[in-house]
Amino acid sequence: MQSPDGQETGRPAAILIAGPTASGKSALGLRIARAFGGTVINTDSMQVYADLRVLSARPTAEEEGLAPHRLYGSIDGAVNFSVGHFQRQAAALLSEMDAGTLPVFVGGTGLYFRSLDEGISDLPEVPDAIRQRIRAEADGQPTETLHAALALRDPESAQGLRPSDRMRVMRALEIHAATGRSIGSFHDARVPGPLAGKPLLKLFLTTEREALRQRIDARFVTMMEQGALDEVAALRERRLDPLLPVMRAHGVPGLTAYLDGTISREEAIQRGQGDTRRYAKRQFTWFRHQMGEDWRWTTPEAAWSQVEARLSAPAGR
């Protein structure tokens, strides 16, 4: 059922909590799960990795013990975990959950949230042998050179990509090598989301920008005190592909450079803080322009009142 302003008013099948990094999403999700018998489900592309508890700001072991948490820290850093992988895991988890359990999806990755409701393009899996061959050929080449190579093989994809966007250029090259088709040719075929058509409460947590920037900077310093450098040192020892998501997480490149001796510790911290602030800005922009009007922009304090109101409503009303 909807209110006169078009918002759902009945009890939701799931709660979706998004927002910029350091906005209080995890704390709100845990509070909801404890109060209403819910399970907190990770919806953040970095918090899936076992290697990054500290740098991804994953819930602590103590917090995870207060309510069920799923899809956190379950993936090895060597895996190129995609939105398709997330959607399949989330769908499987939802099918296994008891009927009375409230799913509480928490995170900052917009495409993950979109995959739950609107679905995603049905992109094919790229065999490891092809991915490794393409990346070996690309090693040491400027991204602009790779973009030019893509333009020769797949002009349609190249036209829609910035010549400096190495990750997406590489993805287009891999898809074309594996299928002989443009990556854009797969966009019309969609995999429906596991929450499509269900009543949902979608909350985007917002806060005053300067306060958020200060929290981001302070949190990165705290991460350093909690072992962020040890996490990066362990990743560095594994010599993983620098294009893997885990190697591009905020803080990893700068701290790797510090361990390599090319920048100072203070410069590494400043780089991590700056990268995270810019990411938060992109999160605001992306959700504002890419997600539907059914997302409620709210403060963490006001969000709790909205949750209480919706969860106290009888189902179907």
Curated annotation (Swiss-Prot):
Record text on subunit structure and interactions: Monomer.
Domain of life according to the entry: Bacteria
Family to which this protein belongs: Belongs to the IPP transferase family.
PANTHER family (UniProt xref): TRNA DIMETHYLALLYLTRANSFERASE
EC number: 2.5.1.75
Gene source species: Methylorubrum extorquens (strain CM4 / NCIMB 13688)
Name listed for the protein in its UniProt record: tRNA dimethylallyltransferase
Catalyzed reactions: adenosine(37) in tRNA + dimethylallyl diphosphate = N(6)-dimethylallyladenosine(37) in tRNA + diphosphate
Keyword Nucleotide-binding recorded: yes
